[in-house]
Swiss-Prot record:
The EC number(s) this enzyme carries: 2.1.2.1
Residues engaged in binding (6S)-5,6,7,8-tetrahydrofolate: 131, 135-137
Protein name (database record): Serine hydroxymethyltransferase
Site positions for Plays an important role in substrate specificity: 239
Principal place of residence: cytoplasm
Stored Pfam families: SHMT
This protein's UniProt keywords: Amino-acid biosynthesis, Cytoplasm, One-carbon metabolism, Pyridoxal phosphate, Transferase
A GO CC term attached to the entry: cytosol
Pathway where this protein functions: One-carbon metabolism; tetrahydrofolate interconversion; Amino-acid biosynthesis; glycine biosynthesis; glycine from L-serine: step 1/1
Cofactors: pyridoxal 5'-phosphate
Keyword Transferase: yes
Species this protein is from: Gluconobacter oxydans (strain 621H)
Length: 434
């Protein structure tokens, strides 16, 4: 037996495409590509990354370990990964006007956990928007580390209009004197008053942390208030409205907090950063600095408002009465259908959405009375306001027919064909991977 691998073995290892090496995985990827090509994606937390972002993410950088920060690594051979990480950092700081940035968090949840570690100790009090009112798990929800490691106090929204109850938030802050006040959400469609959060944080001696995961792209385009100048720490994902690879980021203008953040990310939470993902982030941040990206975000906002208006005109109850962002929360009770059922029916018609609790929801969390809709992904493929109004019509027809046993299947099948025809007018990737 030769001590060396054969040349044919090496050629296959370094050059053979996925379909030759693993047909089973290749088939799954191609079927997912078909699903994305032929379906309308309305999940507000999803988007479509550019092919350039995916190419960077599927690069040789996946081979490289790089624990530490640029210029201060625990491994050799980091000259090129240092360059790409510094590029990502510099671009990110330019986008949001931040003094310091960490691009290493593997996810938004990791970014939030690192921010909590930098700002507080286990047992400290944290004040965040409740999950039931549109907050995120990582903002103090009981099942999450943020609700287990910290004394979590939750504010909510007003029953009469679904808007954040700032008076309640301020009263709770004065009563509990939290170490951190969290502003941000996963299902809140309106602009957040960061100045009011900053004022009460200063009054009670709290840090202000803003999670802008959902609206970061709109901030980058100047269409949503920038929280970075007012927050002690700002976190975000990179794959929602920022339209990049899946991952997280942390921003601050405070040099002392920057050091704490860096230590919290590594060695506090993570080992080696995912350098191939950081390369994808660098590409996405470069795109976010372009005029095209700003125009895209304007369409994201206009399209969300068009969809909300169309659904409202068709008898749907839009929580808060509209949207200031990419996101719409729909109360389905006037249509007498649950979020769980609506999600399943829409998926059969080629429209992907997610069931979502509405404020003061009487249904269980896995059933819900609402659905959450978002415009980023369909806007990325080219849909405009007219197409989003068509989507609103399709949603109405399918969900209305769902209550008519004799007609539901035929309507769903017809709308599914309309969905595929609409999607073919706005094609996306022609292959599943770079």
């Amino acid at each position: 037996m030769s001590e060396h691998a054969s040349q044919s073995t090496l050629n296959r290892f370094f050059h053979a495409p996925l379909k030759e090496v693993d047909a089973e995985v290749a088939t799954i990827l191609n079927e997912e590509l078909t699903r994305q090509q032929d379906g309308i994606e309305l999940i507000a937390s999803e988007n479509m990354a550019s092919f350039a972002v995916m190419e960077a993410q599927g690069s040789v950088l996946t081979n490289k370990y790089a624990e530490g920060l640029p210029g201060k690594r625990y491994y050799g051979g980091c000259v090129d990964v240092d360059r790409v990480e510094n590029l990502a950092i510099d671009r990110l700081k330019k986008i949001f006007g931040a003094e310091f940035a960490n691009v290493q968090p593997h996810s938004g949840a990791n970014a939030n956990q690192a921010a909590f570690m930098a700002l507080a100790k286990p047992g400290d009090t944290v004040l965040g928007l409740s999950l039931a009112a549109g907050g995120h798990l990582t903002h103090g929800a009981a099942p999450n580390y943020s609700g287990k490691w910290f004394n979590s106090v939750q504010y909510g929204v007003r029953a009469e209009d679904g808007l954040i109850d700032y008076d309640q938030m301020e009263a709770l802050a004065r009563e509990h004197k939290p170490k951190i006040i969290v502003a941000g959400s996963s299902a809140y469609p309106r602009v957040i008053d960061f100045a009011r959060f900053r004022k009460i944080a200063d009054e009670v001696g709290a840090y202000l942390m803003v999670d802008m995961a959902h609206f970061a792209g709109l901030v980058a385009a100047g269409l949503y208030p920038n929280p970075v100048p007012m927050a002690d720490i700002t976190t975000s994902t990179t794959h929602k409205t920022l339209r990049g690879p899946r991952g997280g980021i942390i921003l601050t203008n405070n040099p002392d907090l920057a050091k704490k953040v860096n230590s919290a990310v590594f060695p506090g939470l993570q080992g080696g950063p995912l350098m191939h993902v950081i390369a994808g982030k660098a590409v996405a941040f470069g795109e976010a600095l372009s005029d095209e990206f700003k125009a895209y975000q304007k369409r994201v906002l206009a399209n969300a408002r068009a969809l909300a208006d169309e659904l409202q005109n068709r008898g749907f109850d839009i929580v808060t009465g509209g949207t200031d962002s990419h996101l719409i929360l729909v109360d389905l009770r006037p249509k007498k259908v649950t979020g769980k059922l609506a999600e399943a029916i829409l998926e059969r018609a080629g429209i992907t959405a997610n069931k979502n609790a509405i404020p003061f929801d009487p249904e269980k969390p896995f059933v819900t009375s609402g659905i959450r809709l978002g415009s980023p992904a369909a806007t990325a493929r080219g849909f405009g306001e007219a197409e989003f109004r068509e989507v609103g019509r399709m949603i109405d027809e399918v969900l209305t027919a769902a209550l008519e046993e004799d007609n539901a299947e035929a309507v769903t099948a017809r709308v599914h064909e309309e969905v595929k025809a609409l999607c073919r007018r706005f094609p996306i990737y022609d292959r599943a991977s770079a």
